[in-house]
Amino acid sequence: MASARLLTLCFLVFFTTPLFASDPHPPQLNVSFLARPAPIVQDGSTRLVYEMVITNFSNNKYVLDAVEAKAGTAQFTFGGSALAGMTVRLGAWGQPEGAADRTIDGGRSVIVFLLLDLGNSKAASTIEHMLQVVDEKGDAHAVVPAPLVVSNENPIVVSPPLRGDWIAGDSVNNRPDAAHRRAVLVDGGHAWLAQRYAIDWVQYQTVDGVRTTWKGPEDRNDSYFCYNQPIYSVATGKVVDMADGLPENVPHSAKYAIAIEFNNAAGNHVVVEIAPNRYVLYAHMRPGTVQFKVGDMVKVGDILGHVGNTGSSTEPHLHMHIDDQPSFLAGNGVPYEFTQGSESGPVNANVSSPTAISFGPIGPQRPFTNDYPAENALVTFK
């Protein structure tokens, strides 16, 4: 049995040696992935975003001590509290993050949410991984799954869905409390992450010298600057799903206007097929404002509806994402980039809370083309 010290040495030279010595008692851990990652340019940096599922097929307990990933010449090592914050045990959603999340009990599974920042480098064709686990006796083991093939598809480039000054709320990130990033749901016997690259768009203005997203009673939808703003089609395509007439929520109320179910979480919405297996979803629209019906063709810049607060929504905003199925929740989220805009920040702000936002020094606006904004970036679309 390899000692922990020997395994550490092996771990450091993992990618320079073809294989570890045979383990007489290999951990019965199966490693799979929710989907093949595809590169995305976020705030000027190439990133790979994906999820590793580890299932323990034995009765033994293991602690996930470290995960190493290699994509081309870029190498990443995750361990300790950082790895704990990236790891969730199935059945423990919403529980406090901590070391216990790295424990893989017999017959249980964990998901490790990975985000590899490659900087200016191009994405490699494969990602190699090594997992370091420790058994109940304190012995260390290495698990080396087959290389993960990276998708060679480029992100879809689309036009802006809005005009003016906006905050890109909860765009793809790896925080433990990232709502979109952790929204793994099962439908049809398959685990999906449709909202992997979703963004909640909230408009801001400067009021009395303070940047804020609202002014007036916080329990009124029309107090929020984004409310009733037009939503523009980001691409040419065909409407394949829509809903209108669902009532609006009272902002930050203790309950929704309707009982939230799988099929109404998007509220009033429009889904547009813009390419084979590529669907844009615009969610939470104001009732009575949806302009198209199923089967209609739309073109870039058409007004689809207006920003509202319907479905699973706590205050007015536009939720937008692109996935490979015509569904809000049952699909695989795919990367996309916007043709143009300017970006500053990001800011340290909870855009779902109706409070004035102290942005602090945010630097100058940076014009961009074909880019996806950083989490909570201030984005201007014209």
List where the protein language model places each region.
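Asparagine-centered strand-capping/turn motif at beta-strand->loop junctions
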Residues: I54-K61
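Intrinsically disordered, low-complexity Pro/Gly/Ser/Thr-rich segments with frequent PxxP/GP/PP motifs
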Residues: F76-S121
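Acidic, glycine-rich catalytic/binding loops that coordinate metals and/or anionic ligands
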Residues: N152-S171, A179-R182, T212, A257-E261, ...
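Short glycine/threonine/proline-enriched tight-turn/helix- or strand-capping micro-motif at secondary-structure
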Residues: A179-S233, M242-N263
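Short histidine-centered loop motifs in beta-beta connectors
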Residues: Y232, I274, R278-G301
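A structural signal for short beta-strand/turn segments enriched in small hydrophobics and glycine
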Residues: G237-V239, G295-V307
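Zn2+-dependent peptidoglycan hydrolase active-site motif and core
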Residues: K238-R286
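Short, solvent-exposed loop/turn segments enriched in Ser/Thr/Gly
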Residues: L34, G44-E51
